[in-house]
């Protein structure tokens, strides 16, 4: 950030106008063709003086495994610390792999019955909150937690232990069924919100998908097996640990 200058920021902005791919989603009863024409004309007028060469999204589906874990600590005048652990994962190349990722994430850390919530948060009280989220197509997972800085090492160790538990297949059929129910319900409620539906459609565009209806994913979700969850999570490799701590507490 310190290296950014007004000139470099302006150059980046100019490059964005010339190369950025623009995707617009429209949800509602209006005629799509009429809306498309309005936006096309507006962008034509705004950018007609530029030589546009939009860059298509190009996802590298190779998993990035770091040579060593990067650790970053910053200090602020605060009481509650924050830790984020970043993991490299095998990118999900198709809808089936994405369904496996959703179930695995629900079991590990994105639900009220997850390993992280039930153990790191509830049983051991190492965090104020602890949850995971996965960007399956990009091949990464984040575990985000609020902690007392003094508990950082214990919390990190337990988060990794719970990952090991999932990788070993140490979860029950009840946990699998709860995960299926949670993910299916989440898919069904996407269409309840225009913003959620817009995000879904944009994600489909970026990933090269063609599913306009989130409920199309339900059958794949219900078919996910415990073995698939175990094998998927075994690809997780810790890449970075970020700690935001109070003054003198990050040492």
PLM segments and residue spans:
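Charge-rich, well-structured scaffold segments of protease-associated domains
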Residues: 1-55, 91, 122-251
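His/Glu-based metal-binding/catalytic segments typifying zinc-dependent metallopeptidases
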Residues: 52-115, 244-245
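Ligand/cofactor pocket segment of small-molecule handling proteins
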Residues: 119
């Amino acid at each position: 950030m310190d290296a950014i200058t007004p000139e470099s920021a302006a150059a980046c902005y100019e490059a964005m106008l010339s190369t950025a791919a623009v995707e617009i989603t429209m949800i509602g009863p209006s005629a799509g063709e009429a809306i498309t024409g309005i936006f096309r004309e507006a962008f034509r007028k705004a950018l007609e003086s530029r030589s546009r060469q939009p860059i298509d999204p190009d996802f590298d589906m190779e998993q990035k495994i770091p040579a060593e874990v990067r650790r970053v600590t910053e200090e602020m005048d605060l009481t509650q610390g924050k830790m984020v652990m970043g993991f490299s994962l095998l990118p999900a190349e198709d809808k089936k792999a994405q369904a496996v990722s959703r179930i695995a994430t629900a079991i590990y850390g994105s639900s009220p019955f997850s390993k992280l919530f039930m153990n790191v948060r509830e049983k051991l009280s190492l965090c104020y909150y602890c949850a995971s989220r996965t960007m399956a197509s990009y091949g990464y997972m984040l575990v985000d937690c609020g902690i007392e800085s003094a508990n950082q090492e214990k919390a990190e160790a337990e988060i990794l232990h719970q990952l090991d538990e999932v990788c070993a297949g140490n979860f029950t059929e009840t946990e699998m069924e709860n995960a299926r129910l949670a993910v299916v319900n989440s898919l069904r409620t996407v269409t309840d919100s225009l913003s959620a539906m817009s995000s879904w459609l944009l994600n489909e565009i970026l990933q090269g998908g063609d599913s306009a209806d989130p409920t199309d994913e339900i059958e794949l979700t219900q078919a996910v097996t415990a073995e698939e969850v175990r094998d998927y999570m075994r690809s997780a490799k810790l890449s970075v640990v970020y700690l935001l701590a109070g003054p003198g507490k990050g040492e």
